[in-house]
From Swiss-Prot:
UniProt name for this protein: ATP-dependent helicase/nuclease subunit A
E.C. designation(s): 3.1.-.-, 5.6.2.4
Subunit structure of this chain's protein: Heterodimer of AddA and AddB/RexB.
Cofactor: Mg(2+)
Residues involved in ATP binding: A48, S49, A50, G51, S52, G53, K54, T55
Amino acid sequence: MRIDEGFLTPEAIARLQQEEALSDKTHKRTAQQIEAIYSSGQNILVSASAGSGKTFVMVERILDKILRGIPVDRLFISTFTVKAATELIERIEKKLHTAIAETQDYQLKAYLNDQLQALSQADIGTMDAFAQKLVHQHGYVLGISPHFRIIQDKAEQDILKREVFRQVFEDYMSQTDNKAFIQLVQNFSGRRKDSSAFREIVDSIYAFSQSTANPSSWLAEVFLRGSKTYTSFADIPDQAVDTLLACMQDTADQLRDLTDMEGYAQTTKAGKLTAKYTKHLKMIDSLYEWALHFDSLYGKARLGQLAQELTALLPSGADITVAGHKYPIFKSLQEQLVGFRHLETILAYQQESLPLLEVLQAFVISFSEAYLAAKMQENAFEFSDIAHFAIEILQQAPDIRQAYQGHYHEVMVDEYQDNNHMQERLLELLSNGHNRFMVGDIKQSIYRFRQADPQIFNQKFKDYQSNPEHGKLILLKENFRSQSEVLNVTNAVFSRLMDESLGEITYDDKHQLVAGSEAQKQLHPENRAQLLLYNTDQAQEGTEEASTNDGISAGEVTLVAKEIIRLYNEEKVAFEDITLLVSSRTRNDTIFQVFNQYGIPLVADGGQENYLKSVEVMVMLDTLRSINNPLNDYALVALMRSPMFSFDEDQLARISLQSSSQDQPQAFYDKLSNSLRGQGEHPGLIGQELMTKLVDFDRTLSDWRQFAKLHSLYELIWKVFNDRFYFDFVASQPKAEQAQANLYALAIRADQFEQSGYKGLSRFIGMIDKVLETQNDLADVEVERPKHAVNLMTIHKSKGLEFHYVFILNCDKRFAMADLQAPIILNRDEGIGIKYVANVKELLRDEKLASLKVTMETLPYQLNKQQLRLATLSEQMRLLYVAMTRAEKKVYLVGKASKEKIQAKTADNSSEGRLALASRERLLSFQDWLLAITATFSKEDLFIDVRFVDDSDLTAEAVGQLRSSGLLQADDLKDNRQTEDIARALDMLDKVSKLNASYQAAIELPTVRTPSQLKTLYEPLMDTDGVDIIDQPYHRPKSFDLPDFSKKKAVEPSQIGSSLHELMQRIPMSDQVTAGDIEQALQFVSADAEVKARIDIKKVTSFFATTELGQLLQEHHQCLHREAPFAMLKKDSLSQEQYVVRGIIDGYLLFEDRIVLFDYKTDHYQHSAELKQRYQQQMDLYAEALSQSYGIARIEKYLVLMGGSQLEVVRLDE
């Protein structure tokens, strides 16, 4: 290729596509990729599905431009992140090196070397970076010094912002006519007594405006648009009415389906329609009729009347119960009716809110101007300021704009679906109108919280699709990442979920994923997608699994651990090929705990700025706060409750009752001091154990406070670590390496704080508290990531990455919809909608009431809320798409649910192969969507298996263990700081172990033994003649088997034995024990039904009815002692040390001249002689204890044997 060779014509591109298709290349470029690489002369939008090779296309296109004589510095290339820009530059650099090596043309080599040198100076990076460069060069147009700095510390931003707010607020409050402003502040203050709630409102409006192309224009022209437009029923948009009517029809459809269910009683025994069925039929008919004939029956003007009639028609509750299951079919419609029901009243009072909104508009504009002025004075700006400056420069200076437009051959942008309107305006100004190249995928737009607007992409998609003269639309559908099992399930799910109404694009043939190679099309049935649900039916009430908690349960994580162990053991999958995806990087401790339990290495990509919220750092900060000021109740109690001192709730409650006076409240530290002196109101509550802990705590805290006066913060923190072993303690917890790094960093940051000239604990605490007050944090401490570990990251963090096996966890977590209840809701096109606090006193006509305040959702608020709800659900849908398309081989979706309820679930309504819009809007979790799809559509077409996992599947035995991967290596502790006390303790242990050898016999002798233990001890130590050979060592067998905590397991003989003993204890003894007495006693035995069923009641009855011993017990029941505890001293023959034997005797009859001792045994046996020999020593011990206690030498000993085929009572002293 010559440097000056022209760009390919459409005909040349078509020939190249044909040649590529006929070539024998292993990795062929698709026709669409070739078109995207070589097309030119107009704006181009590339809609690139997941895994379709968009980065490859961009790199090839850039290289083609360079090879055709376009220097790299004449290309504007925007990426979403700095990391993406770095990777793109590295790929271009590699391609250029390859091109240089392959060509023999010295002129081309020289040119390509020049491009390599120019690459570092080319405009390849984020929009923020380019805007800074432009303002540095041309900021003089706006009077901005080129020496400005960026305020990157959010804490600094917030401090400055608060100060500006305070000044503007005081200005408005000091005005003579401030009545409307005061009412405005009160409208948003709620129960707060300060202006903080109003400040949060202003902050949110300011932040939102900054994402627009022109903030001041948006505030002036759009901010009040909705409030001035939507003032009557006639102004309600058709879409809002259509949504209500669709919800009515969907409710009718669901109700009709429920009435057709098998468990629904349509008729009485006499064959007549039940009253419930008649009522429901009326509901169904009315809902259908009112929805279908809305225009003729009501129209917008009578929408309030429809809402009231619907309210009267529907039940007050949201559920209908069929066959014991509740179905919340009315919930969605009732939520829709809340606003419409009282809309006439709301519209009347809404007029009062407009003057307040005009004041709010003026205040936000004043604040924005004052905040910018303050930043100008500091010559320090935020990224958004710089971007707006860049836009303003290009708009105000045509010569500068034309220079950029003439310079750039092409304006390229990656991840176009995540652009906001400010960025879009900047790109428009840099382009000459027909040289834009935009790559993105609206299905992966997941940054709405950063004010990204996927509609920018969508509008261009539709425009280019309908009007090719405006630009070329290229679809990259082929996926080169995932196997067919992943592609098929993704297509099956989203073709039934995503459309223009919800998802903001219709998932049809244009967007469905297609396997890009033959290898991907090969079927692997073992990799079929799975929806794994932990069955909460068996979870005990009150447990995490049984609750409606959205958090990740231990059951969910255990089933994931089980599958990972299977993959590792059986399929030899490496840990690093497995990734867990979660919606949030917080509250994931359960995952670490369970993985720790099973030895599965796990590394979390935790993101940034979560440091001060880590538990170990919060504990240390509260420790420092307590040292600085022990009168800080919250910090002091947190310190006492922490693992350093471990005071429990009961102990803290006892201390809290030790006030010295009921008249004045006292700090918790004063109550602690009262407790120590015994001067509290209830000194009797402070026991000796608690007093000992209090003395230790008070002495330690006093020591720390004294130490803090004379030493640095660094030394103080390490003293706390050493005194209470806290640094060593966190090493035993989940995420130990990260926790220790955080604590070490706290000491380092405290040292840096003092090195910078600030001194003192008080100032350090003040600095930390100021950071926290502004809801900011410090950057997390990075630790070295293990190479071979399962990955844990958020879905947002995973975007652009790929993994062999993906587990999407916590699919049952409800979507975050808190923004729908906020005091204000902003819309880019309609402006603000608010909740207005109206005084409705005149409606009640009650002169006694001074005022009656009611919070109303104004019509603009309701309309914005509906738009926000759809936007939120659409983004959640795209999040699920991103998560599922990260998988190369297999995707697992994991959640928890009641199996019984899910199996009783009816199919949802569908339309044109998708779930009905009302159904999709009603469902509020990934799991809800997936289960609705599987219940509604043929399972064969969904390419996913739904499997419930019970507790019985998650026992330690069922989960299994990781296969051994060779010898374990010693931990590398060279970088850990070991406390001095630990070092001394290790030395002491080494010396003590040598001393122990000299007194081994006495050391190993237990202070207390039970008869059963002694029986086990005696058996190997006594020969047939009873000769003592106890000097031979006895080794107790050790077991390292994992305990089995499953619910369903086989009944153990020990359980039967324990339950039988309890039964014999509970039977009421009298002259005649009946079968009824025994059955009644069995009801009170604390055992499972399975265990009770194994007790042989016939043998128990026979014992009392047919045996001499049983008759004797009934005849002399007044002499009977049951479950009698005893204790006696014995001497060890080897060490000559005494020890205590303790035990419980099943029963004995106490007579004046003798004792009849008996014991129940359930051991299985063939000959009774076996058990006589086995239990002889144990019964002798019982007899010896009774003889010592009562001074009676004659002891008759009986074993009641119930483990054989027949009941037997044998006497041991015969």
